[in-house]
């Protein structure tokens, strides 16, 4: 059985890890870095770039370079968070036929899971290159506060990337696993995991206990905001720069997509620099131009200014912390350790606020970028049976229920219930002789159903005619270990039942997923062909270069006919290399190799002759030197004794 890899599919960066024995290993990608930007670029020739190569070309291709797509996964186009992003992103966010938020690139509509699958495929390939074997199974992390639709969409992304997703695991829980597994402290510990990433914020209160030699991780509560993260901090800096430039130069950069892409890069860089220095300078020459000529942007930003710009964003993270503590039934003083996860937690002001709330310094021995992937890999080793000393008890982040008479949300499973879990309850009809009931499933905390997220609906039909309130319809909710919901309804009188796995009231259909899997496989085949063609061209270029060099040096030793044949073969190979037929290039490489064989023999013979001359000269020199040394009659033969150090 192959290894189950752990993938942290992040909004801004992604990371992949495996367990070697009991030691977690974060794997470097082909660019040599341990994290990969979650950026995907669609090129004009059909090539898809992922990670650093996509990030490098973003400035010149802003409309077809996608980032922070995780913020759209499993969301409806009409949601206010999505509407807010439409005005900020240089790429287009469009409404799919089923009402979901999709993205538009190069005249095609793409579903967010399809785009995220490109990042997952890169993570899969990174692991395969390191292990030297195919990888088919993974544990993928999601923000703890992701709802059912978002979890389902993440699972779909894994399938499109060719991965069997063994488990969806919450990011703070994964970080707690990574933290807890290498600590030998005995006794129960309560930890708070504060996870502020590129696009989402989570807070989880987790108890780590030793139970009969087994480490038990029990999530007591979780809370968060799936639309708050580093991208929002960047946006505040961008807005500030745009405002200052408008005041200074009278030019509005907010409608210039090329300028916006450069501003985004500069804002992210400034934010990172201000975590370690008090002031930074943003310098962007030729940012735009008007009738008077080119305009340059030069602006200093202090740490204090940045903190003022984002103060309310940091404050927004504290209320969920308060709720999580209350839901866990603990006091702040009972928290033993605070763990910071996500790149944004490197910001001194964030650390300061966390310290102020929890009354203690956060641990510094957890890598905020890698802990989540490491935890996912640990969970993978538990699922594969390699580790038997870990038990993970996670929770559902939001309450689940159905709409009942008067539009009320009747909760079936309350938030922070340990999963997997089941719950059943009996309901009845609202009207006389009602032949069917519609079960509408919602997720959220509001009292009225419409204030919550509709996950899906289905009908139970064939109810025998009877007065209202008489039929007994048992509705059952069953949440699996991935946090994905299965709902059933059964008429106890007739035994008729209907069950659905909540796929969100839209999401991707099975046919769409299969089509995307096929597209991905076709792309992989295209990529393979493109790589083989590039290799063939490289081989052709190298052979042409070395043959031309040899002809220049040794061509006069060849007969005129031989030289002409070689030159003709070089031209044919150069023409073939400009085309796109790999077989043609291979054939011309073979042809040039054959006609230049004589030339190769001449080169080899010449090198042998030169080596022979040098050897003869060297031997003569050494002989002369030997003769020149006078005999010394006073040389004494010394006795020697071998010393053995290994005693």
Curated annotation (Swiss-Prot):
Positions with biased composition (Low complexity): 611-631
Record InterPro entries: ATPase_NBD, Chaperone_DnaK, Heat_shock_70_CS, HSP70_C_sf, HSP70_peptide-bd_sf, Hsp_70_fam
Q: Name one GO molecular function term.
A: ATP binding
| Name of the molecule in the record | Chaperone protein DnaK
Q: Which UniProt keywords apply?
A: ATP-binding, Chaperone, Nucleotide-binding, Phosphoprotein, Stress response
Which segment of the chain is annotated as a signal peptide?
A: none
What is expression of this protein induced or repressed by? By stress conditions e.g. heat shock.
Q: Which PROSITE patterns match?
A: HSP70_1 (PS00297), HSP70_2 (PS00329), HSP70_3 (PS01036)
Give the record's family classification.
Answer: Belongs to the heat shock protein 70 family.
- Specify one Pfam family: HSP70
Bias class Basic and acidic residues marks the residues at 638-647
State the organism of origin.
Answer: Cupriavidus pinatubonensis (strain JMP 134 / LMG 1197) (Cupriavidus necator (strain JMP 134))
Modification Phosphothreonine occurs at: 200
Q: Residue ranges of region Disordered?
A: 611-647
Q: Does the keyword Nucleus apply?
A: no
Q: What does this protein do?
A: Acts as a chaperone.
């Amino acid at each position: 059985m192959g290894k189950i890899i752990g993938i942290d599919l992040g909004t801004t960066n992604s990371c992949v890890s495996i367990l070697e024995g009991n030691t977690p290993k974060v794997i470097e990608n082909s660019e040599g870095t341990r994290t990969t930007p979650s950026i995907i670029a669609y090129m004009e020739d059909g090539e898809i770039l992922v990670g650093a190569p996509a990030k490098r070309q973003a400035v010149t291709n802003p409309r077809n370079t996608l980032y922070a797509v995780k913020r759209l996964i499993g969301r409806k186009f009409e949601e206010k968070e999505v509407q807010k992003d439409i005005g900020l992103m240089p790429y287009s966010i469009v409404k799919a036929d089923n009402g979901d938020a999709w993205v538009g690139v190069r005249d095609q509509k793409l579903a967010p899971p399809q785009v995220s699958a490109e990042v997952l495929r890169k993570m899969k390939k990174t692991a395969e290159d390191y292990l030297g074997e195919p990888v088919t199974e993974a544990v993928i992390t999601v923000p703890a506060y992701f709802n059912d639709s978002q979890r389902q969409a993440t699972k779909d992304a894994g399938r499109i990337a060719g991965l069997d997703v063994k488990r969806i695991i919450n990011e703070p829980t994964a970080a707690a696993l990574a933290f807890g597994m290498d600590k030998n402290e005995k006794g129960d510990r309560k930890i708070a995991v504060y996870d502020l990433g590129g696009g989402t914020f989570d807070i989880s209160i987790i108890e780590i206990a030793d139970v009969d030699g087994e480490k038990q991780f029990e999530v007591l509560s979780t809370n968060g905001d799936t639309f708050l993260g580093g991208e929002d901090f960047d946006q505040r800096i961008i807005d500030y720069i745009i405002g200052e430039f408008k005041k200074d130069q009278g030019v509005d950069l907010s409608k210039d997509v090329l300028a916006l892409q450069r501003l985004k890069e500069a804002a992210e860089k400034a934010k990172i620099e201000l975590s370690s220095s008090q002031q930074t300078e943003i310098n962007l020459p030729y940012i735009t131009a008007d009738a008077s000529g080119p305009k340059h942007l030069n602006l200093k930003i202090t740490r204090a200014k940045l903190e003022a710009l984002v103060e309310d964003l940091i404050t927004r993270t504290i209320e969920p912390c308060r709720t999580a503590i209350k839901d866990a039934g603990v006091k702040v003083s009972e928290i033993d350790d605070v763990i910071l996860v996500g790149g944004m937690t490197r910001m001194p002001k964030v650390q300061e606020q966390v310290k102020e709330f929890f009354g203690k310094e956060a641990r510094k021995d957890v890598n905020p970028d890698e802990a989540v992937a490491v935890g996912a890999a640990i969970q993978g080793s538990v699922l594969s049976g390699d580790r038997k000393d870990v038990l993970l008890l996670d929770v559902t982040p939001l309450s689940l229920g159905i709409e009942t008479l008067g539009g009320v949300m009747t909760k079936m499973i309350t938030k922070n219930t340990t999963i997997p879990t089941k719950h059943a309850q009996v309901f009845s009809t609202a009207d006389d002789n009602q032949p069917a009931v519609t079960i509408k499933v919602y997720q959220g905390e509001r009292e009225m159903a419409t204030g919550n997220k509709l996950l899906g609906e289905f009908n139970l039909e064939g109810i025998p005619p009877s007065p209202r309130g008489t039929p007994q319809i048992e509705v059952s909710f069953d949440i699996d270990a991935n946090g994905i919901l299965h709902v059933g309804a059964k008429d106890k009188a007739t035994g008729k039942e209907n069950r659905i796995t909540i796929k969100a009231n839209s999401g991707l259909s099975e046919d769409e997923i299969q089509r995307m899997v096929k597209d991905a496989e076709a792309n992989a085949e295209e990529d393979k062909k493109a790589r083989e063609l590039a290799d063939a061209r490289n081989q052709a270029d190298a052979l042409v270069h070395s043959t031309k060099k040899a002809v220049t040096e040794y061509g006069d030793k060849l007969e005129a006919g031989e030289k002409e044949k070689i030159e003709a073969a070089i031209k044919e190979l150069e023409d073939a290399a400009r085309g796109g037929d790999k077989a043609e290039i291979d054939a011309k490489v073979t042809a040039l190799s054959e006609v230049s064989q004589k030339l190769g023999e001449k080169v080899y013979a010449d090198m042998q002759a030169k080596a022979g001359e040098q050897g003869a000269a060297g031997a003569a020199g050494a002989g002369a030197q030997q003769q020149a040394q006078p005999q010394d009659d006073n040389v004494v033969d010394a006795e020697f004794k071998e010393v053995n150090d290994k005693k």
